[in-house]
Swiss-Prot record:
Listed Basic and acidic residues bias regions: 369-385
PANTHER family linked to this entry: DNA MISMATCH REPAIR PROTEIN MLH, PMS, MUTL, DNA MISMATCH REPAIR PROTEIN MLH1
Gene label: mutL
Any GO CC annotation of this UniProt entry: mismatch repair complex
Positions of the UniProt region annotated as Disordered: 360-396
Name listed for the protein in its UniProt record: DNA mismatch repair protein MutL
Keyword tags: DNA damage, DNA repair
Domain of life assignment: Bacteria
Alphabetized GO MF terms: ATP binding; ATP hydrolysis activity; ATP-dependent DNA damage sensor activity; mismatched DNA binding
CDD domains: HATPase_MutL-MLH-PMS-like, MutL_Trans_MutL
Pfam family, one: DNA_mis_repair
Functional description taken from the UniProt entry: This protein is involved in the repair of mismatches in DNA. It is required for dam-dependent methyl-directed DNA mismatch repair. May act as a 'molecular matchmaker', a protein that promotes the formation of a stable complex between two or more DNA-binding proteins in an ATP-dependent manner without itself being part of a final effector complex.
GO biological process, alphabetically ordered: mismatch repair
Length: 624
């Protein structure tokens, strides 16, 4: 047979074999087109699992009359135009083949109107000859796509479709993933005329909580740990379930790269390694994570359905994700603080900060615990202590796994504690009210609300008070950075930072090297340049390129310096992690302060706490 060019319809049907796997694939492609068009509301109507009808209606920018027919043509798109665009893709779609492929195996109708047009236009195409008919129509600004009789002209493909319930289940999962990617978009999903899912657009944290809970369930919210990390052009945020929650939730894994839903093996491997042996081989972590990468550093044009990407610096991305998840898991314990006298038995001359909430020992100022004695101590106080382990095998460090197994079996009473309140992420109202009282017999009170931008209104008995959150945060950091005799534990940086110093700063770095080591800073001076390799955990999220030169400049002015004075300097020069505070963050901060700094509760310093005078308001009301 001689070589010949395939007819357009046959070529599109071949492409449809990759793009249109099942009705859920059609929904994914069309909804992503709506998101690229700037839609804030998307209505999805399904009949008979998508075999009879798939209708997607949005309020996006729409398609002009002159572009309607071209929109159904193969390799026609408005999203890229040059090779440079292809190498830095920011849209969800870019190949220009989805509509052509779908129309080749269905009867497709596209109705659209732009803001500049006075009337809408409708384009119709079906698989036989790919002819497109355009005619006037009535439609608001936006687009509606109707896909009728999917695979009507490819009986073999239609025969492989599953039951109506199964196909709709796949559609439901696709919509769930898209709803998690775009909290700002309202999405409604109907099946056979019945509204099945309604995801309202989220504008504040309480609405984010409701939407996340409606998709992932309340159990995920209860065990979710907030994660937010940034390094250079890499940013990761979202939620990971603690190991106890991951064991209960089963496989719930949602990952997004630049807002594109993804099933990437590199990302999954990094997260699985972060959990080490805290999960069995047949258990999987649960997470909802959003990774932001420079578009030039990631190639999304490597998979037909765009489910996988290729990172230009894969090892860097892997280590970044691994370190971020590991740090969050180390910061949070498996159980709340015991309501016993254990806290009173701890030494008090130096505030002993901890790098996790409501559990156990001081991981900022204590050295790494000895593995040999771990089994004789409470399991919940040492479960997160081991250093991160790198291993690509299926066992994830077998020796560590044996130790974890012993720890988990050592103290049976730890099991009921897992049901108690943990680090507040999106806690229920009752938990928010009781959390500040759980850590210590001394409490500021109950957080009622946040008075923007940074004040917490607190109820303590019959009195109301305003608490200055940045001041409380500063005192907490001073406690966290005040080392014990062993010094603060250094946390290695993913990428060492190199800084240029003047002579005075370089001399100060050498002169104060013992002090810097005590503070958990690994600084190496070489010919007027310093390489920063490790910092204590409270400094990981800071702008180190700015902070370290300021620190060395300060040390250059002093021949002698104590760790306590330097901890105070750090506390006053560190940037806040919160531009706008919310109730959960305030409760978290107060829990830490009450736990680590009970002196502040007994004798609040100036500028921290201010009683609210209700007498004047009551007097005014009585006079009225």
């Amino acid at each position: 047979m001689p070589i010949q060019v395939l007819p357009p319809q046959l070529a599109n049907q071949i492409a449809a074999g990759e793009v249109v796997e099942r009705p859920a694939s059609v929904v994914k492609e069309l909804v992503e087109n709506s998101l690229d068009a700037g839609a804030t509301r998307i209505d999805i109507d399904i009949e008979r699992g998508g075999a009879k009808l798939i209708r997607i209606r949005d309020n996006g920018s729409g398609i002009g009359k002159d572009d309607l027919a071209l929109a159904l043509a193969r390799h026609a798109t408005s999203k890229i135009s040059t090779l440079d665009d292809l190498e830095a893709i920011v849209s969800l779609g870019f190949r220009g083949e989805a509509l052509a492929s779908i129309s080749s195996v269905s009867r497709l109708t596209l109705t659209s109107r732009t803001a500049e047009q006075n009337e809408a236009w409708q384009a119709y195409a079906e698989g036989r000859d790919q002819a497109v008919t355009v005619k006037p129509a009535a439609h608001p600004i936006g687009s509606t796509l109707e896909v009728l009789d999917l695979f009507y002209n490819t009986p073999a493909r239609r025969k492989f479709m599953r039951t109506e319930k199964t196909e709709f289940g796949h559609i439901d999962e696709v919509v769930r993933r898209i709803a998690l990617a775009r909290f700002d978009v309202a999405i409604n999903l109907s099946h056979n005329g019945k509204l099945m899912r309604q995801y309202r657009a989220a504008k504040d944290e309480s609405q984010y909580e409701r939407r996340l809970g409606s998709i992932c369930g309340p159990a995920f919210l209860q065990h979710a740990l907030n994660i937010s990390w940034q390094h250079g052009d890499l940013t990761i945020r979202g939620w990971v379930a603690d190991p106890a929650g991951a064991r209960q939730l089963g496989e719930m894994q949602y990952c997004y790269v630049n807002s594109r839903m993804m099933r990437d093996r590199l990302i999954n491997h990094a997260i699985r390694q972060a959990y080490q042996d805290q999960l069995k081989d047949d258990q999987q972590p649960a997470y909802v994570l959003y990774l932001e990468v420079d578009p030039h550093q990631v190639d999304v044009n490597v998979h037909p359905a765009k489910h996988e990407v290729r990172f230009h610096q894969a090892r860097l991305v892997h280590d970044f994700i691994y370190q971020a998840v590991t740090t969050v898991l180390q910061q949070v314990g498996n159980a709340p603080l015991p309501l016993t006298d254990e806290t009173e038995q701890q030494p008090t001359p130096v505030w002993q900060p901890e790098n996790r909430v409501a559990a156990g020992g001081n991981h900022f100022s204590q050295p790494a615990p000895r593995r040999e004695t771990a089994s004789t101590e409470p399991a919940v106080a040492r479960e997160r202590a081991p250093q991160p382990a790198y291993h690509s095998g299926s066992g994830y460090q077998k020796r560590e796994g044996e130790l974890y197994g012993k720890l988990l079996q050592a103290t049976p009473v730890a099991e009921p504690r897992q049901e108690a309140p943990k680090q507040p992420l999106f806690p229920p109202v009752k938990t928010e009210q009781e959390t500040p009282l759980a850590g210590s017999q001394h409490s500021f009170g109950r957080v009622l609300m946040i008075y923007p931008p940074c004040y917490a209104l607190i109820e303590n008995g019959q009195q109301l008070m305003l608490l200055n959150l940045p001041v409380a945060e500063r005192w907490l950091r001073q406690a966290q950075l005040n080392p014990s005799q062993e010094g603060l534990r250094p946390q290695p940086l993913l990428i060492p930072i190199k800084l240029t110093l003047n002579k005075q700063e370089a001399a100060a770095c050498i002169h104060h090297q013992p002090l810097l080591v005590t503070m958990g800073l690994d600084l190496q001076v070489d010919h007027g340049r310093v390489t920063l390799r490790a910092v204590p955990l409270p400094l990981r999220q800071q702008n180190l390129q700015k902070l370290i030169p300021e620190l060395l400049g300060y040390l250059a002015e002093h021949q002698e310096m104590s760790p306590a004075v330097l901890a105070t300097w750090f506390a006053r020069h560190l940037g806040s992690e919160h531009e706008q505070w919310n109730t959960s963050q305030a409760i978290q901060l107060l829990t830490d302060v009450e736990r680590l700094c009970p002196q502040l509760v007994k004798s609040p310093p100036s500028g921290l706490l201010q009683p609210v005078d209700l007498q004047a308001a009551l007097t005014a009301l009585r006079h009225d």
